[in-house]
Structures are given as C-alpha cells and as structure tokens.
Amino acid sequence: MSELTLIRTDSDHTDFRQLVALLDQDLAVRDGDDHAFYAQFNKVDAIKEVIVAYQNDVPVGCGAIKPFSATEAEVKRMYVHQDYRKQGIAAKIVTALENWATETGFSATVLETGKKQPEAIALYQKIGYQITPNYGQYVGVDNSVCMIKPLNAHHQTPNA
C-alpha cells in the first residue's frame, strides 16, 4: 500500500484549488441543471481549515471545514480523485477534519451532499453520519441530503 499523507492548510493552497476544480467538473455533470444553484454555496475563499491528501507525493483528495454554528462545523469540498477511490482515503480525510473540528471546540459536524452521489451518502453513513432535516440554504431542496455527526472529545481514527 502506498503511503498516504494528510496536511493541514488553507483554501489558498494550489493543490486544494486544483482538486476543487476537478470536484466542480464532476459535480457539474452530476448536478446538471442544478449545478449553478449549488455552486453559489461552494466558494472556497472564506475556508481556513483544509486537508489535502497525498499518495506518494501526488495530491489525491481534499476536504475542508468551516464554522456553521457556535457548536457545529460544516464539512465542505470533499473530493477524492477517481483513480484513488475505494481505498479509504475519503474516510481518513473526514476523520482528520473531525479531529480538527474537535480541537477548535466544535461538538458536531454537519454536511450536505447530493442524492446523485450515493457513494458519498454510503460513506458518510458508514462512518457515523445520520441524515438530518435539510438546513440553511438546503431547506426545501429535493436533491440535497443533509447529515450530522456528534463528535467525541477524543480524537478518532478512521475505521473505513
């Protein structure tokens, strides 16, 4: 198995920006006519906590968190390059983000994904996320699936 390295950075990181561009291309295909609606909520300029995953020094995945409420961080911009999927990388990125959220005082993470991303929904459920009523800008949006996970005060290790 190749070595996976996760780094903490911010949204200005070049590798993060390149991975997000690939994510946006994927979402444009999946979301179709709904893409412009979702894209307005996926700006990265205000994101300060970013994880970039490298396998053998190649950027293969990313994710981010940003404050959602006083107690919840929102997981944003999760992506693993298609050539590196099904290796547990996404679960490791999410776990690293959850640990970072815990370190910064959050007690839960929330996220939004799409019904057209069944593999993402399955992953999040596998690692402890539960479907919750759509929140914020996603209220009433039929293609959105919102999820929540309470965080332990102890750091976690991925089990996926």
Located regions from the model:
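Conserved phosphate-binding and hydrolysis motifs of nucleotide-dependent enzymes
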Residues: 57, 61, 88-90, 128
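Acetyl-CoA-dependent GNAT
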Residues: 2-76, 81-83, 94-95, 134-137, ...
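Alpha-helical interaction/dimerization surfaces of two-component signaling modules
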Residues: 19, 23-26, 100, 123, ...
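Short coil/turn segments at alpha/beta junctions that flank glycine-rich nucleotide-binding fingerprints
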Residues: 71, 87, 103-107
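Conserved GNAT acetyl-CoA-binding A-motif
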Residues: 94, 101-112
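C-terminal "cap" of GNAT-fold acetyltransferases
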Residues: 3-4, 9-12, 17, 107-110, ...
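Conserved acetyl-CoA-binding loop-helix of GNAT-fold acetyltransferases
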Residues: 80, 86-99, 126
